[in-house]
Amino acid sequence: MNIGPFLFFIQLLWSIPHLPIFKSTNASRFKVRSLPDSPALPTSWAGRLPVPGRKDGNEIFFWLFEAENKAYDDTFIIWFNGGPGCSSLVGLMGGNGPISFDGNSTLLEHNPYSWTQLGHVLYVDQPVGTGFSTASNPYPVTTNEMITADFVAWLNGFFTYFPHLQSKRIHLMGESYAGIYIPYFTAALVESNTSHPLDIRSMSLGDGSWGNAAAMSSVAMGAYMRSQATALKLPSDILSAFNAADQSCGFDDVLAQAQIYPPKGKINIPGNPENFNYRRRRRDMTDVLNASCSISPKTVADVNESIFNSTCYGPCATYSTAMDYVDTASAGGTGIPCFDVYDIHHDCSTIDTLTLMAEYFSRADVQAALHVSGRGTYGACNSTILGTLLGAPSAVPPAYSILPNLVTERSISLHIYNGEWDMLLNHIGTELSIQNMTWRGAQGFSTKPQQLFYVDDAMPMNSSDMTGPGGRNATTKVAGNWAEERGVSYHLFRGAGHSVFANKPREMFAYVRDVVVGARNGW
């Protein structure tokens, strides 16, 4: 697919950051001295920087941590949460940063599996208006092109304060909607920053929305429900209704093709059967798109009516119908109590990190420590941004058409991972999307991702190797299954949901160490 117009757009905007907007490049004003109710922090800097080319009031918040281990001084990780419109502090506080909440309190404790032990780590609240970032009114960012241009321009300004990071080995990592952000950001950075090329080594997409929308939603939903029928408490007649829908809609044939290794050819994905990418839900939010469409299906007849005859969802709406059915069963007492689409094993006792974040980061003393005084009430996710960007036309070209070029022509490694308990963006849709992608002269993986990886060894040379970097031995627990070919890796984590590090911080630490930062040469 031709991405020339997109890159030309970025190249035009790349000149904007060179305007004399940044009056001072003294980073000391961003130094974080301490944080209330927190153990000692690694050296860090936080605050807001304006987006060059935007009018006053559009500023992006960052929190930068210095590498704790000098052996990883050459590594620079940039972390993005998704949403769109969710703060990167969700990742920082949720399992990959140096601090986390102590149980269900807002007291902070040290995280022994912080990625700051593996490199310099930058958390960015983008697009403007996300988390501690600010935005003008009316909301100025309405397209993916704008998001990309803003971030690229902002990052160039960021490097004027922290120029030593510009020469590091850069790894862009994120989850969920960051599966769309990261391919565009990477393409723009490698195409536009020609005078001072960045050494971008890899992209990591966790439970990301990077693939074909139908493939990652309706096509894969029935198969996921079958694989998790017991956990989802699905009656046999309801499961049969979804099985029949898969056959009627041709989804079973699509998935059968994806189970052939290597693929026999391009897999035809039905054209977006639900008339939009997929329903997006967030904790403590009502549905942003098509909220009135839910018919609360309880019976087989209700399910069939929603799948085949909904005037809201469109034809073959297995994804939205599944979400509605499981939600309805949960509310009615026959399903999973307090059902969470992000992790089907969550229940009513699960700690709500977003609520704790809202309480802690709304404190005036915390905001003063992070140099964002006067922000007022903090929200981890911004529903205005979510509605604005998900209601906009899909990004063109799609993210999955950009990734192969970055891997093939730019030699940038691509690491994809999923948690098995994520229903929002389930692993079956991810695996289908990988098998339908062509890079470095071949389509998909040639063998099924069934090699084992382990708690402290995310990239064993072979499944019988018992001397991995984490000191693995015969009693070490299996963490999941994986594969890698031609510069692309895929890991499926057992016992994890949408945010893998929230369930499996130790395993994700090994993943970043072994796969992202320490990947073998020749990828």
What are these regions (language model features)?
Residues 2-523:
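Terminal and linker regions of secretory-pathway proteins
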